[in-house]
Amino acid sequence: MNILITNDDGINARGIKTLAEKMSKKHNVTIVAPREQKSASSHSISINIPIKIREEKIDGLDCKAYSLVGTPADCTQAGISLLVKDIDLVISGINRGFNSGTDILYSGTVSAAIEGAIYDVPSIAISMDVKWDRDDEDYSKAANWVNKVVDLAEKKYLKKNVVLNVNVPNINEEDIKGLKVCKIGKSTYKTEYVLLEEDNDKVYQTRGVRNQVEKDESDLYFLSQGYVTLTPLHFDFTNFKELNEVKKIFE
Protein backbone atom coordinates (compact mmCIF):
# COMPACT_ATOMS: atom_id res chain seq x y z
CA MET A 1 0.00 0.00 0.00
CA ASN A 2 0.92 3.65 -0.35
CA ILE A 3 0.96 5.00 3.20
CA LEU A 4 1.14 8.63 4.30
CA ILE A 5 2.66 8.95 7.78
CA THR A 6 2.29 12.07 9.91
CA ASN A 7 2.19 13.08 13.58
CA ASP A 8 1.97 16.04 15.94
CA ASP A 9 5.28 15.52 17.79
CA GLY A 10 7.27 16.72 14.79
CA ILE A 11 9.35 15.16 12.04
CA ASN A 12 12.32 14.53 14.35
CA ALA A 13 10.30 12.61 16.93
CA ARG A 14 11.41 9.10 17.82
CA GLY A 15 7.91 7.65 17.36
CA ILE A 16 7.41 8.65 13.74
CA LYS A 17 10.81 7.23 12.75
CA THR A 18 10.04 3.89 14.42
CA LEU A 19 6.66 3.77 12.68
CA ALA A 20 8.15 4.58 9.27
CA GLU A 21 10.86 1.93 9.70
CA LYS A 22 8.22 -0.70 10.45
CA MET A 23 5.79 0.26 7.69
CA SER A 24 8.53 0.61 5.06
CA LYS A 25 9.28 -3.11 5.25
CA LYS A 26 6.05 -3.96 3.39
CA HIS A 27 4.65 -0.66 2.08
CA ASN A 28 5.55 2.49 0.17
CA VAL A 29 5.84 5.19 2.82
CA THR A 30 5.92 8.97 2.60
CA ILE A 31 6.31 11.15 5.70
CA VAL A 32 4.72 14.60 5.91
CA ALA A 33 5.08 15.94 9.43
CA PRO A 34 5.29 19.26 11.29
CA ARG A 35 8.73 20.83 11.39
CA GLU A 36 8.23 21.59 15.09
CA GLN A 37 6.34 20.15 18.06
CA LYS A 38 2.59 20.63 17.55
CA SER A 39 1.02 18.57 20.34
CA ALA A 40 -2.54 19.50 21.35
CA SER A 41 -3.11 21.34 18.07
CA SER A 42 -6.49 19.65 17.78
CA HIS A 43 -7.93 20.03 14.25
CA SER A 44 -6.59 23.51 13.59
CA ILE A 45 -5.47 24.39 10.06
CA SER A 46 -3.51 27.31 8.64
CA ILE A 47 -5.80 29.98 7.19
CA ASN A 48 -4.36 33.12 5.56
CA ILE A 49 -0.90 31.92 6.60
CA PRO A 50 1.61 30.62 4.01
CA ILE A 51 2.54 26.98 4.49
CA LYS A 52 6.23 26.18 4.08
CA ILE A 53 7.23 22.69 2.90
CA ARG A 54 10.76 21.30 2.70
CA GLU A 55 12.01 17.89 1.61
CA GLU A 56 14.01 16.20 4.36
CA LYS A 57 16.44 13.32 4.75
CA ILE A 58 15.93 11.27 7.90
CA ASP A 59 18.86 9.13 9.02
CA GLY A 60 18.16 5.43 8.61
CA LEU A 61 15.14 5.89 6.35
CA ASP A 62 14.98 5.63 2.56
CA CYS A 63 11.42 6.91 2.22
CA LYS A 64 10.43 10.37 1.00
CA ALA A 65 9.99 12.84 3.84
CA TYR A 66 8.74 16.40 4.05
CA SER A 67 8.60 18.85 6.94
CA LEU A 68 5.82 21.41 7.01
CA VAL A 69 5.52 24.67 8.93
CA GLY A 70 1.91 24.22 9.94
CA THR A 71 -0.41 21.95 11.87
CA PRO A 72 -0.83 18.16 11.83
CA ALA A 73 -4.07 18.51 9.86
CA ASP A 74 -2.19 20.71 7.36
CA CYS A 75 0.31 17.88 6.93
CA THR A 76 -2.37 15.35 6.05
CA GLN A 77 -4.08 17.79 3.72
CA ALA A 78 -0.83 18.67 1.92
CA GLY A 79 0.14 15.02 1.68
CA ILE A 80 -3.15 14.06 0.07
CA SER A 81 -3.65 17.14 -2.12
CA LEU A 82 -0.10 17.99 -3.17
CA LEU A 83 2.75 15.64 -2.27
CA VAL A 84 1.62 12.02 -2.61
CA LYS A 85 -0.43 10.28 -5.29
CA ASP A 86 -2.92 7.47 -4.68
CA ILE A 87 -2.72 7.21 -0.89
CA ASP A 88 -4.27 4.01 0.44
CA LEU A 89 -3.85 4.72 4.14
CA VAL A 90 -2.95 7.55 6.53
CA ILE A 91 -1.21 6.65 9.80
CA SER A 92 -0.64 9.33 12.41
CA GLY A 93 1.86 8.65 15.20
CA ILE A 94 3.43 7.02 17.06
CA ASN A 95 2.39 9.67 19.55
CA ARG A 96 4.34 10.27 22.75
CA GLY A 97 1.58 9.61 25.27
CA PHE A 98 -1.96 8.24 25.15
CA ASN A 99 -4.65 9.77 22.96
CA SER A 100 -7.56 8.21 24.78
CA GLY A 101 -10.89 9.23 26.23
CA THR A 102 -12.20 12.69 25.45
CA ASP A 103 -8.58 13.88 25.25
CA ILE A 104 -8.81 12.94 21.57
CA LEU A 105 -10.59 16.27 21.08
CA TYR A 106 -7.32 18.08 21.85
CA SER A 107 -5.09 15.70 19.93
CA GLY A 108 -3.20 16.78 16.83
CA THR A 109 -2.34 13.12 16.23
CA VAL A 110 -5.97 12.00 16.10
CA SER A 111 -7.01 15.09 14.14
CA ALA A 112 -4.38 14.40 11.48
CA ALA A 113 -5.93 10.95 11.04
CA ILE A 114 -9.45 12.38 10.97
CA GLU A 115 -8.36 14.79 8.24
CA GLY A 116 -7.51 11.73 6.17
CA ALA A 117 -11.00 10.32 6.71
CA ILE A 118 -12.53 13.66 5.67
CA TYR A 119 -10.66 13.23 2.38
CA ASP A 120 -12.01 9.66 2.05
CA VAL A 121 -8.72 7.97 2.93
CA PRO A 122 -8.78 5.18 5.57
CA SER A 123 -6.81 6.36 8.59
CA ILE A 124 -5.22 5.11 11.80
CA ALA A 125 -3.97 7.03 14.84
CA ILE A 126 -1.42 5.24 17.04
CA SER A 127 -0.25 6.41 20.47
CA MET A 128 1.79 4.93 23.31
CA ASP A 129 1.95 5.75 27.00
CA VAL A 130 5.35 7.03 28.15
CA LYS A 131 7.29 8.00 31.22
CA TRP A 132 7.36 11.76 30.95
CA ASP A 133 10.63 12.19 32.82
CA ARG A 134 12.62 10.51 30.04
CA ASP A 135 12.99 10.88 26.29
CA ASP A 136 14.47 7.54 25.22
CA GLU A 137 11.27 5.56 24.80
CA ASP A 138 11.29 2.36 22.76
CA TYR A 139 8.30 2.58 20.43
CA SER A 140 8.84 -0.84 18.87
CA LYS A 141 5.95 -2.49 20.71
CA ALA A 142 3.56 0.19 19.48
CA ALA A 143 4.93 -0.28 15.95
CA ASN A 144 4.37 -4.03 16.24
CA TRP A 145 0.76 -3.55 17.34
CA VAL A 146 -0.11 -1.03 14.65
CA ASN A 147 1.49 -3.37 12.12
CA LYS A 148 -0.92 -6.11 13.23
CA VAL A 149 -3.83 -3.69 12.86
CA VAL A 150 -2.68 -2.61 9.39
CA ASP A 151 -2.26 -6.22 8.22
CA LEU A 152 -5.76 -7.17 9.34
CA ALA A 153 -7.34 -3.92 8.14
CA GLU A 154 -5.78 -4.35 4.69
CA LYS A 155 -7.43 -7.77 4.38
CA LYS A 156 -10.78 -7.12 6.03
CA TYR A 157 -11.42 -3.51 7.03
CA LEU A 158 -10.27 -0.41 5.19
CA LYS A 159 -13.14 2.07 5.26
CA LYS A 160 -12.57 5.50 3.81
CA ASN A 161 -14.51 7.50 6.41
CA VAL A 162 -13.37 5.67 9.56
CA VAL A 163 -10.40 6.35 11.83
CA LEU A 164 -9.06 3.50 13.97
CA ASN A 165 -7.65 5.03 17.16
CA VAL A 166 -5.08 2.69 18.73
CA ASN A 167 -3.44 3.13 22.15
CA VAL A 168 -0.66 0.99 23.62
CA PRO A 169 0.15 0.84 27.37
CA ASN A 170 3.70 1.41 28.56
CA ILE A 171 4.37 -2.06 29.93
CA ASN A 172 6.56 -4.93 28.76
CA GLU A 173 5.26 -6.25 25.46
CA GLU A 174 4.90 -9.77 26.85
CA ASP A 175 2.69 -8.41 29.65
CA ILE A 176 0.12 -6.86 27.29
CA LYS A 177 -3.08 -8.88 27.71
CA GLY A 178 -4.40 -8.41 24.18
CA LEU A 179 -6.48 -5.92 22.22
CA LYS A 180 -9.90 -4.57 23.16
CA VAL A 181 -12.22 -2.80 20.73
CA CYS A 182 -14.11 -0.32 22.87
CA LYS A 183 -15.70 3.10 23.25
CA ILE A 184 -13.83 6.19 24.37
CA GLY A 185 -14.06 7.15 28.03
CA LYS A 186 -14.57 10.55 29.62
CA SER A 187 -11.27 12.13 30.65
CA THR A 188 -11.63 14.50 33.60
CA TYR A 189 -8.86 16.26 35.49
CA LYS A 190 -8.18 18.21 38.62
CA THR A 191 -6.56 21.27 37.10
CA GLU A 192 -4.29 23.52 39.13
CA TYR A 193 -3.32 27.02 37.99
CA VAL A 194 0.12 28.00 39.29
CA LEU A 195 0.90 31.73 39.22
CA LEU A 196 4.34 32.27 37.66
CA GLU A 197 4.48 36.04 37.45
CA GLU A 198 2.26 39.07 37.77
CA ASP A 199 2.71 42.28 35.81
CA ASN A 200 0.08 43.72 33.49
CA ASP A 201 -0.93 40.11 32.91
CA LYS A 202 -1.04 37.30 35.38
CA VAL A 203 0.93 34.38 33.92
CA TYR A 204 -0.17 30.89 34.93
CA GLN A 205 1.11 27.37 34.33
CA THR A 206 -1.58 24.71 34.34
CA ARG A 207 -1.08 21.28 35.88
CA GLY A 208 -3.66 18.57 35.42
CA VAL A 209 -4.03 15.31 37.33
CA ARG A 210 -6.46 12.80 35.84
CA ASN A 211 -9.31 11.76 38.09
CA GLN A 212 -9.82 8.10 38.89
CA VAL A 213 -10.73 5.96 35.89
CA GLU A 214 -14.19 4.42 36.09
CA LYS A 215 -14.62 0.67 35.72
CA ASP A 216 -16.51 0.65 32.45
CA GLU A 217 -16.07 -0.71 28.93
CA SER A 218 -13.96 2.26 27.81
CA ASP A 219 -10.46 2.73 26.44
CA LEU A 220 -9.37 4.44 29.66
CA TYR A 221 -10.34 1.41 31.74
CA PHE A 222 -8.88 -1.25 29.44
CA LEU A 223 -5.60 0.67 29.12
CA SER A 224 -5.35 0.77 32.90
CA GLN A 225 -5.78 -3.02 32.88
CA GLY A 226 -2.92 -3.65 30.44
CA TYR A 227 -4.75 -3.95 27.11
CA VAL A 228 -4.12 -2.30 23.78
CA THR A 229 -7.29 -0.43 22.80
CA LEU A 230 -8.85 0.25 19.41
CA THR A 231 -11.77 2.62 18.92
CA PRO A 232 -13.41 3.42 15.57
CA LEU A 233 -13.90 7.19 15.24
CA HIS A 234 -15.83 9.43 12.85
CA PHE A 235 -15.74 13.15 12.13
CA ASP A 236 -19.54 13.55 12.40
CA PHE A 237 -20.21 15.07 15.84
CA THR A 238 -23.99 14.87 15.49
CA ASN A 239 -25.70 13.63 18.66
CA PHE A 240 -28.13 11.29 16.89
CA LYS A 241 -29.63 10.15 20.20
CA GLU A 242 -30.94 13.68 20.80
CA LEU A 243 -31.63 14.73 17.20
CA ASN A 244 -35.35 13.89 17.04
CA GLU A 245 -36.14 15.40 20.44
CA VAL A 246 -34.32 18.62 19.55
CA LYS A 247 -36.24 18.74 16.24
CA LYS A 248 -39.56 18.53 18.08
CA ILE A 249 -38.62 21.40 20.38
CA PHE A 250 -36.87 23.83 18.05
CA GLU A 251 -38.33 23.33 14.55
From Swiss-Prot:
Role summary: Nucleotidase that shows phosphatase activity on nucleoside 5'-monophosphates.
Any GO CC annotation of this UniProt entry: cytoplasm
InterPro entries: SurE (IPR030048), SurE-like_Pase/nucleotidase (IPR002828), SurE-like_sf (IPR036523)
Signal peptide (from-to): none
EC assignment: 3.1.3.5
Protein name: 5'-nucleotidase SurE
Main location: cytoplasm
Needed cofactors: a divalent metal cation
Catalytic reaction annotation: a ribonucleoside 5'-phosphate + H2O = a ribonucleoside + phosphate
Subcellular location: Cytoplasm
Family statement: Belongs to the SurE nucleotidase family.
Gene: surE
GO function terms (MF aspect): 3'-nucleotidase activity; 5'-nucleotidase activity; exopolyphosphatase activity; metal ion binding; nucleotide binding
Native species: Clostridium botulinum (strain Alaska E43 / Type E3)
UniProt binding sites for a divalent metal cation: D8, D9, S39, N95
Keywords associated with the record: Cytoplasm, Hydrolase, Metal-binding, Nucleotide-binding
